[in-house]
Amino acid sequence: MQEETPSFLKKFCEDEWTKCSSEERITLIQLLSNYEAEKLGIPKVSVVSGRIDLVTLGYYDDEKNEIVVDIEHMREDSARDVTVTILHETYHAYQYYLAKNIDFNSEISKTAYFDTARSWRDNSLNYIDGHENREGYSAQPLEESARAFAQEEYKNLKPMIEE
Protein backbone atom coordinates (compact mmCIF):
# COMPACT_ATOMS: atom_id res chain seq x y z
CA MET A 1 0.00 0.00 0.00
CA GLN A 2 1.47 3.34 -1.05
CA GLU A 3 1.47 6.14 1.52
CA GLU A 4 -0.27 9.37 0.69
CA THR A 5 2.07 12.27 0.01
CA PRO A 6 1.99 14.76 2.89
CA SER A 7 0.40 17.93 1.48
CA PHE A 8 3.01 20.25 3.03
CA LEU A 9 5.73 18.80 0.76
CA LYS A 10 4.20 20.52 -2.26
CA LYS A 11 5.06 23.87 -0.63
CA PHE A 12 8.75 23.03 -1.13
CA CYS A 13 8.29 23.43 -4.88
CA GLU A 14 10.17 26.61 -5.88
CA ASP A 15 7.04 28.36 -7.18
CA GLU A 16 5.21 27.75 -3.91
CA TRP A 17 8.23 28.41 -1.67
CA THR A 18 8.76 31.90 -3.07
CA LYS A 19 5.18 32.83 -2.09
CA CYS A 20 5.68 31.83 1.56
CA SER A 21 6.44 34.29 4.34
CA SER A 22 9.27 33.65 6.80
CA GLU A 23 6.71 32.43 9.35
CA GLU A 24 5.20 30.03 6.83
CA ARG A 25 8.65 28.77 5.88
CA ILE A 26 9.66 28.00 9.46
CA THR A 27 6.35 26.12 9.90
CA LEU A 28 7.03 24.12 6.73
CA ILE A 29 10.59 23.39 7.84
CA GLN A 30 9.27 22.15 11.19
CA LEU A 31 6.79 19.88 9.41
CA LEU A 32 9.58 18.50 7.23
CA SER A 33 11.79 17.80 10.23
CA ASN A 34 8.86 16.13 12.06
CA TYR A 35 8.16 13.99 8.99
CA GLU A 36 11.78 12.87 8.76
CA ALA A 37 12.08 12.30 12.53
CA GLU A 38 9.08 9.99 12.39
CA LYS A 39 10.59 8.07 9.46
CA LEU A 40 13.91 7.80 11.32
CA GLY A 41 12.18 6.70 14.53
CA ILE A 42 13.46 9.51 16.74
CA PRO A 43 11.75 12.16 18.88
CA LYS A 44 10.71 15.34 17.10
CA VAL A 45 13.31 18.10 16.90
CA SER A 46 12.45 21.74 17.52
CA VAL A 47 13.33 24.02 14.59
CA VAL A 48 14.05 27.73 15.03
CA SER A 49 15.58 30.40 12.84
CA GLY A 50 18.17 33.01 13.67
CA ARG A 51 21.20 34.75 12.28
CA ILE A 52 24.15 32.38 12.64
CA ASP A 53 27.18 33.61 10.70
CA LEU A 54 28.27 34.13 7.12
CA VAL A 55 28.97 30.47 6.32
CA THR A 56 26.75 28.27 8.52
CA LEU A 57 23.40 27.39 6.96
CA GLY A 58 22.12 25.51 9.98
CA TYR A 59 23.19 23.37 12.89
CA TYR A 60 21.83 20.78 15.30
CA ASP A 61 22.17 21.49 19.03
CA ASP A 62 22.18 18.13 20.79
CA GLU A 63 21.73 19.61 24.27
CA LYS A 64 18.51 21.38 23.25
CA ASN A 65 17.43 18.83 20.61
CA GLU A 66 17.03 21.81 18.32
CA ILE A 67 17.86 22.74 14.75
CA VAL A 68 18.79 26.35 14.12
CA VAL A 69 18.46 27.39 10.49
CA ASP A 70 20.09 30.61 9.37
CA ILE A 71 17.35 33.15 8.73
CA GLU A 72 19.06 34.57 5.64
CA HIS A 73 19.45 31.06 4.21
CA MET A 74 15.75 30.40 4.84
CA ARG A 75 14.65 33.72 3.31
CA GLU A 76 16.98 33.95 0.31
CA ASP A 77 18.06 30.49 -0.82
CA SER A 78 16.17 27.96 -2.91
CA ALA A 79 13.62 25.58 -1.44
CA ARG A 80 15.90 22.73 -2.52
CA ASP A 81 18.89 24.12 -0.60
CA VAL A 82 16.85 24.77 2.54
CA THR A 83 15.29 21.30 2.32
CA VAL A 84 18.71 19.67 2.05
CA THR A 85 19.90 21.66 5.08
CA ILE A 86 16.93 20.49 7.17
CA LEU A 87 17.38 16.88 6.05
CA HIS A 88 21.08 17.10 6.95
CA GLU A 89 20.43 18.58 10.38
CA THR A 90 17.57 16.20 11.19
CA TYR A 91 19.90 13.34 10.36
CA HIS A 92 22.36 14.75 12.90
CA ALA A 93 19.56 14.44 15.47
CA TYR A 94 19.23 10.78 14.47
CA GLN A 95 22.99 10.23 14.74
CA TYR A 96 23.20 11.80 18.18
CA TYR A 97 20.09 9.91 19.32
CA LEU A 98 21.75 6.60 18.42
CA ALA A 99 25.11 7.64 19.88
CA LYS A 100 23.40 8.47 23.19
CA ASN A 101 20.99 5.54 23.41
CA ILE A 102 22.92 2.50 22.23
CA ASP A 103 24.62 0.61 25.04
CA PHE A 104 28.07 0.41 23.52
CA ASN A 105 29.22 -1.86 26.36
CA SER A 106 26.80 -4.64 25.40
CA GLU A 107 28.08 -7.63 23.46
CA ILE A 108 25.66 -7.07 20.58
CA SER A 109 26.87 -3.49 20.07
CA LYS A 110 30.40 -4.76 19.52
CA THR A 111 29.33 -6.45 16.27
CA ALA A 112 30.04 -4.99 12.85
CA TYR A 113 26.37 -3.99 12.53
CA PHE A 114 27.00 -1.14 14.98
CA ASP A 115 30.27 0.10 13.45
CA THR A 116 28.71 3.17 11.87
CA ALA A 117 26.88 4.18 15.05
CA ARG A 118 30.10 3.63 17.01
CA SER A 119 31.99 5.89 14.59
CA TRP A 120 29.32 8.57 15.08
CA ARG A 121 29.61 8.29 18.85
CA ASP A 122 33.40 8.54 18.70
CA ASN A 123 33.18 11.45 16.27
CA SER A 124 30.69 13.28 18.51
CA LEU A 125 33.23 13.08 21.33
CA ASN A 126 36.00 14.51 19.09
CA TYR A 127 34.05 16.78 16.78
CA ILE A 128 36.01 19.10 14.46
CA ASP A 129 34.52 22.58 14.06
CA GLY A 130 34.21 23.74 10.46
CA HIS A 131 35.40 27.24 11.30
CA GLU A 132 38.74 25.89 12.51
CA ASN A 133 39.35 23.12 9.97
CA ARG A 134 37.00 22.98 6.98
CA GLU A 135 38.58 19.89 5.42
CA GLY A 136 38.67 17.95 8.69
CA TYR A 137 35.09 18.99 9.41
CA SER A 138 33.84 17.77 6.02
CA ALA A 139 35.63 14.42 6.31
CA GLN A 140 34.11 13.46 9.68
CA PRO A 141 31.82 10.40 9.77
CA LEU A 142 28.95 12.50 11.18
CA GLU A 143 29.18 15.02 8.35
CA GLU A 144 29.79 12.55 5.52
CA SER A 145 26.81 10.43 6.56
CA ALA A 146 24.50 13.44 7.03
CA ARG A 147 25.46 14.85 3.62
CA ALA A 148 24.86 11.50 1.93
CA PHE A 149 21.52 11.04 3.68
CA ALA A 150 20.33 14.56 2.80
CA GLN A 151 21.17 14.14 -0.88
CA GLU A 152 19.56 10.70 -1.13
CA GLU A 153 16.48 11.68 0.83
CA TYR A 154 16.01 14.80 -1.28
CA LYS A 155 15.99 12.56 -4.38
CA ASN A 156 13.27 10.48 -2.69
CA LEU A 157 11.20 13.55 -1.76
CA LYS A 158 11.59 15.40 -5.06
CA PRO A 159 8.84 13.50 -6.93
CA MET A 160 6.43 14.21 -4.04
CA ILE A 161 7.42 17.89 -3.98
CA GLU A 162 6.85 18.20 -7.72
CA GLU A 163 3.50 16.31 -7.82
Place the predicted regions along the sequence by residue:
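Auxiliary, metal-adjacent structural segments of Zn-dependent hydrolase domains
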Residues: Q2-E63
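Short, polar/charged, Gly/Pro-enriched helix-capping and turn/loop motifs at alpha-helix termini
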Residues: P43, K100-N101, M160
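Catalytic Zn2+-binding segment of zinc metalloproteases
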Residues: E89-E107
